[in-house]
Every structure is written in C-alpha cells, then in structure tokens.
Amino acid sequence: WDEDHIPDQQSGMVNDSKSIEHSDTDSAKLVNTKEVNGEKHHIYELNFGCIGNNSVRVNYKLNGEDKFTQFEFNVLDKLSSTIETHSDFVATQTQDNDTSSPTYGIYSDWYFASGKDSTQRSHWGDDWSHDNINFMAMKNYLDPKASEVESIEEYLVDFMWNSYMKNSHDTFAVANYLSDSGIYGGGANPYSRTYSEVMEATGFFNMYRIEKAYPNLINYRKSAEWYLEKAYGIYSNRVSASPIGFYGEQQIPDMIEALYAEGLTDEGDNLKVLFA
C-alpha cells in the first residue's frame, strides 16, 4: 500500500442515513388517524419484504364508488452494501469472459427481464455501457478488491485498448457504438461523442490511481504510467472545454498533477492550456 496515493477515507463519505431495514415479509399497520379540515387521514407503518421497486395499492370508497390509489416506493439497502453488491455483480455477471469472443472483457448492459443485452452491438455508447468502467474504477480506487481490479484490467487492456480502440491508437478516438469500434469496423476515426471518450479517459486514469495507491494488490499487467498515458492521449486528442462544459473536468487537475509527478511536464502543461 502506498500511503502517498491512497485516497482519504472520510467518515460519512458513504451516507447510509437514508437506508431502511427491510423485513422478511410485507406488512401495513394502521398507527393513527387524524382529522384535518374535516378530512380523515389514516397513517400507516409499512414494512417492505424486498429492496427495489415496491407497489402499495390503497383501496377505498368515494361516494359509494370503489376507488384506489397506488404508491411506488424504491426501497434501498445500505448504500455501502449496495455499492459492494453492484460492483460484484458487474464483475462476475456482466463481463464477457470468453477469450474467443470478439467482445472479451466487455461489461455488457443488463436487463432484469432478459439478462445481458443481446442488441448491444447497435445500442452500445455514451448512454450505455461506457459508464460502467467509471463506476468500477472509482469504486476500487476508494475500496479495492483484487478480483475486481483484475476485472478492470481485462476491460481496459483486453477489451477497450486491444479490441475496441485497436484502430485508433494514434487518434485515440473512442467509437460511440460497438458496431463502429475496432472490433467490427476498420476506421481510425469512427463516429464518436466526447462524452464516451471522457468516460474511457477517466476509467484509464482511475486505474492509474488504483495501481499507484495499491501497488502490491495484484500482479499488474501494465504499469501505472501506461494507464496515465492512455488517459492523457484521449484528453489531449479528443476532449476540450468547449464542447462538453464541465463534464468530466473534476479529474483534470488530478491528472495534471499526476503527469507532473511522472515527469511528463509537457503533457501536464498541454492539459493546462486545453482546460484553463
């Protein structure tokens, strides 16, 4: 563990105060009835048997006619538990681990009803799976788990750099859709959106920070500097302040400091010019 690079673990960084304990069974208990301006208000205590979406239907009569009102509650577990559960699910369930697959290493989109997205070749982009790497990398920078960091390596090295971006190593373009990527396309400048490229750049940068903070966590396949170079390459070639406003810019000061720390002074100066 490298104390100089481990992020501050502030108490309260993950706020569990809004979570509730769910019971084994659903229940509704009338606890009080109040009359306000001539109207009766019945107050119930609700216990939900599962996390996620819960529907509550209240049946009543109005002027002798049957009526109902339906409420929708999204019940959360503790946020810390939810984050851990989600990162484990992304790594163990959504990632393509078939080494013979063209999308080996991808974090696929997932639907509750049908599982992995079977149409991701045409639907994949800045509004879809590009954001999964941001969650996984930042979570493991703050709370590392060896198997998940190995999963991130598989995504960034095998999938993103070696396959998805294989035709754009010089341009650093990140295709917005899977169908236009190096896996299925041949161009060095595929259709892209800056939002997609920022997501991948921050994924690479946070992997750099993971390796700097926890150098002995796993046997890393690439150096920390390798990931920093990819993050810088995307930002310097594909991103600027004008088209996306403040999207993703919160990490640029940290990236500039990292470039200087690694002796990449010209690169750090260049990002300053681009985003000052």
How would you label these PLM feature ranges?
Residues 2-82:
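Extended acidic/polar, glycine-enriched regions
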Residues 79-276:
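Catalytic cores of extracellular degradative/oxidative enzymes
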